[in-house]
Amino acid sequence: MELLKQRILKDGRVIGNDILKVDSFLNHQMDVALFNEMGKEFHKQFAHKNITKILTIEASGIGIACIAAQYFNVPVIFAKKTESRNLDSDAYLSEVFSFTKGKTYTIRVSKNYLNSEDTILIIDDFLANGKAALGLAHIVEQSGAKLGGIGIAVEKGFQDGGKLLREKGFDVKSLAIISSMENGRLSFTE
């Protein structure tokens, strides 16, 4: 998606050779107009899959997922990373390692919100090692729902996550795929 690539080039900051800081428009301060265009693009890519729910993980995927959900006219479910007394104890669980945070979380989704009648679209802001998407896919599998696809805003194509998910047969669509971030310079896969 050219609009997203241009915004990354304009406002993104490379830290080291593997961290891309896009908090000014994607995952801290959110550019809702950009999210609207991303939501339209995800709908264009996955409308034929008859999606019934969108699944993401807290926190950075929620904004994009909610905007995209308007185009599918479906609800959004987000997997929680923390235990809470007000979360139903009857939940699907999965272990997820966060590349950004460098730690493992147990994510959970109440069994009340996913079932075998659903076709799920997973949406997230970043794809690096694929662990978040795999954890969410594991939750979809536990529920008996069908995984319609995985929509990613920014994929780090030089890391193994995208390859891993595609080799498992998942329909992964990334709006921007970064092929390199060496020496502070970004390049994209066309």
Swiss-Prot record:
SUPFAM superfamilies: PRTase-like
Stored CDD domains: PRTases_typeI
Entry keyword annotation includes Flavoprotein: no
Chemical reaction(s) catalysed: XMP + diphosphate = xanthine + 5-phospho-alpha-D-ribose 1-diphosphate
InterPro entries: PRibTrfase_dom, PRTase-like, Pur/Pyrimidine_PRTase, Xanthine_PRibTrfase
Domain of life (superkingdom): Bacteria
Main location: cytoplasm
Alphabetic keyword roster: Cytoplasm, Glycosyltransferase, Purine salvage, Transferase
E.C. code: 2.4.2.22
Biological process according to GO: purine ribonucleoside salvage; xanthine metabolic process; XMP salvage
Keyword set includes Protein transport: no
UniProt-annotated location(s): Cytoplasm
Molecular function terms from GO: xanthine phosphoribosyltransferase activity
GO terms under cellular component: cytoplasm
Subunit structure and binding partners: Homodimer.
Alphabetical list of HAMAP family matching this protein: XPRTase (MF_01184)
Biological role: Converts the preformed base xanthine, a product of nucleic acid breakdown, to xanthosine 5'-monophosphate (XMP), so it can be reused for RNA or DNA synthesis.
Family: Belongs to the purine/pyrimidine phosphoribosyltransferase family. Xpt subfamily.
Protein name: Xanthine phosphoribosyltransferase
Naturally occurring in which organism (per UniProt): Ruminiclostridium cellulolyticum (strain ATCC 35319 / DSM 5812 / JCM 6584 / H10)
Gene encoding the protein: xpt
